[in-house]
């Protein structure tokens, strides 16, 4: 794929560099969205488009020694999930199916109890 569309804050580096890309650009965007949902900010925030591009290509994502105290309450599994999604190398960035095997997802899924829903009777329509 080579067509580039989207919001700059969520674009993977390969899109910005106008390189061929795969569905892993969506994994990158998922990482940005997850970061934003957990912190209230995007990881590459700026009011300047060139600075956004620079941040996406080069800014190191860190959760330690920051003024953002909200990361203190976020699990290491969640942080690892974000870092894997935001791998700048699309060849080593995980696929969606690989993400489903990560501890942040599997630990959550294992803790969930499924509800025993009653079977619904099907009414005949006249």
Tell where the protein language model's regions lie, with residue ranges.
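Terminal C-lobe "cap" of eukaryotic-type protein kinase domains
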Residues: 88-92, 97-112
């Amino acid at each position: 794929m080579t067509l580039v569309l989207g919001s700059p804050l969520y674009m993977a580096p390969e899109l910005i560099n106008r390189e061929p890309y795969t569905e892993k650009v969506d994994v990158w965007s998922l990482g940005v969205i997850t970061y934003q949902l957990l912190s209230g900010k995007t990881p590459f925030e700026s009011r300047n488009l060139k600075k956004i591009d620079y941040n996406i290509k080069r800014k190191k994502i860190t959760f330690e020694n920051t003024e953002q105290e909200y990361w203190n309450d976020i699990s290491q599994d969640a942080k690892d999930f974000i870092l894997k999604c935001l791998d700048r190398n699309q060849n080593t960035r995980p696929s969606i199916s690989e993400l489903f095997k990560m501890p942040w997802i599997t630990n959550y899924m294992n803790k969930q109890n499924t509800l025993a829903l009653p079977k619904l009777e099907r009414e005949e329509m006249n």
